[in-house]
């Protein structure tokens, strides 16, 4: 099956009584274009906290008013509880017109019938969207959202530790990376890399790099594919990286926070999101000048390692009375001007490779961007959400392999639990 972008959520039951802010303006009457064609109307957009920087929001709102005559109203949402809130809003008669949805949540919302088909818009403005970034917006062959912005993991390293080990450049291939870790290990003063045994999303990136699928279809249901040789190859790579680390084999990157471990100054590198460098700096201001970034290298210099892509799409609520006006918003917000401005102001990866120049000067974003085209996520099926619920059986698999169990035996030990979770009805 085709790999997709973050674990799709389970379709939760529609709960009455939840509050959803919608639009109360009159419906569009036919297709209209040009200044003032939608004069007097208001388009309501739900966007997540932190997604819309002030400059971008101000400029886009003004441009939207100038182009359409309509007013743009952003309503900021918190991540906590958002899946239920969106699901409820999409079931109501006056939903928000446009909604920012987590990229892997998109197929689940589309499956409920809550999102509009944007296939015509894709044909008009999405010809050069990065395929890997657009994948989560497609469900059953139709375009139900538009890719907005993304982020992925990079190698965050301590330049002083690397220089002390005689390393003069960042690695461009996986083998070069291992040689650098060997050099740091030989120097003996620092832990080459901090990698706990359950950094699940880094492992998922390795499976993507190996072309592996974590689930497969058997009849009309999905089952675990953890015993597949490609998954095994990814786990063997993870094991090789983890052997350079003193981190616990039964913990993830948040226990303890890996950036805080790195901040102590005696770790060569860790694999994380660019913003985690800020966590390290907050813990130890002195380390700021020693922090550098590079793309996680793949087998060859021309293709980075696979990465887990996180991000957001814009979707139009099927129940919105302003379908045409919503599409005008998407055309403008996803234009090169505003997609590029968002990338520059928020340091996020844009939906087109041609816009990556807007990341210049942002070391973490520059390191992340090259891998976006070869990125992916966990399976884009609603059933997947239950698999990642704690305790995640794949994390148990990882720890078992790192502690000496064969990948085949470790997979066999958890596949029944994975299959049980995949069979749960939302």
Predicted regions: what is each one?
Residues 132-136, 294-295, 343-390:
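Long, aromatic- and glycine/proline-rich binding clefts that accommodate carbohydrate-like moieties
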Residues 144-148, 153, 178-224, 267:
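Extracytoplasmic/periplasmic solute-binding protein
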Residues 181-182, 223-251:
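Glycine-centered hinge/linker elements that transmit conformational signals in sensory
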């Amino acid at each position: 099956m085709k790999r997709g972008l973050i674990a799709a959520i389970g379709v939760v039951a529609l709960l009455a009584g939840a509050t959803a802010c919608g639009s109360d303006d009159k419906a569009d009457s036919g297709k209209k274009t040009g200044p003032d064609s939608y004069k007097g109307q208001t388009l309501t957009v739900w966007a997540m906290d932190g997604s819309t920087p002030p400059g971008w929001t101000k400029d886009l709102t003004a441009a939207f008013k100038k182009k359409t005559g309509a007013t743009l109203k952003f309503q900021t949402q918190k991540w906590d509880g958002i899946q239920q809130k969106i699901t409820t809003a999409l079931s109501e008669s006056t939903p928000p017109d446009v909604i920012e949805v987590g990229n892997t949540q998109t197929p689940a919302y589309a499956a409920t019938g809550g999102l509009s088909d944007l296939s015509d818009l894709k044909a008009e403005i999405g010809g050069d969207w990065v395929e890997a970034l657009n994948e989560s917006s497609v469900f059953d062959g139709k375009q139900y959202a538009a890719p907005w912005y993304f982020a992925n993991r990079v190698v965050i390293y301590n330049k002083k530790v690397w220089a002390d080990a005689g390393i003069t450049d960042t690695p461009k291939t996986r083998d070069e990376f291992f040689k650098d870790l060997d050099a740091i290990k030989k120097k003996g003063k620092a832990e080459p890399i901090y990698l706990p045994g359950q950094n699940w999303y880094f492992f998922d990136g390795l499976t993507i790099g190996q072309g592996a699928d974590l689930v497969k279809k058997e009849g009309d249901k999905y089952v675990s594919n953890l015993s597949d040789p490609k998954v095994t190859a990814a786990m063997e790579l993870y094991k090789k990286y983890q052997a350079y680390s003193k981190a616990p084999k039964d913990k993830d990157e948040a226990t303890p926070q890996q950036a805080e471990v790195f901040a102590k100054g005696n770790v060569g590198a860790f694999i994380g999101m660019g913003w985690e460098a800020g966590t390290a700096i907050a813990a130890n201001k002195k380390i700021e000048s020693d922090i550098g970034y590079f793309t996680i290298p793949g087998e060859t210099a021309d293709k980075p390692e696979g990465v887990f892509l996180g991000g957001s799409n814009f979707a139009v609520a099927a129940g919105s009375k302003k379908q045409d006006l919503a599409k005008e918003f998407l055309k403008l917000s996803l234009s090169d001007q505003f997609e590029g401005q968002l990338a520059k102001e928020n340091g996020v990866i844009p939906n087109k490779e041609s816009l990556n120049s807007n990341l210049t000067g942002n070391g973490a974003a520059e390191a992340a961007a090259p891998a976006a085209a070869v990125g992916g996520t966990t399976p884009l099926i609603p059933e997947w959400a239950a698999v990642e619920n704690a305790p995640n059986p794949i994390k148990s698999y990882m720890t078992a392999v790192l502690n000496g169990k064969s990948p085949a035996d470790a997979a066999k030990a958890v596949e029944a639990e994975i299959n049980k979770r995949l069979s749960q009805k939302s």
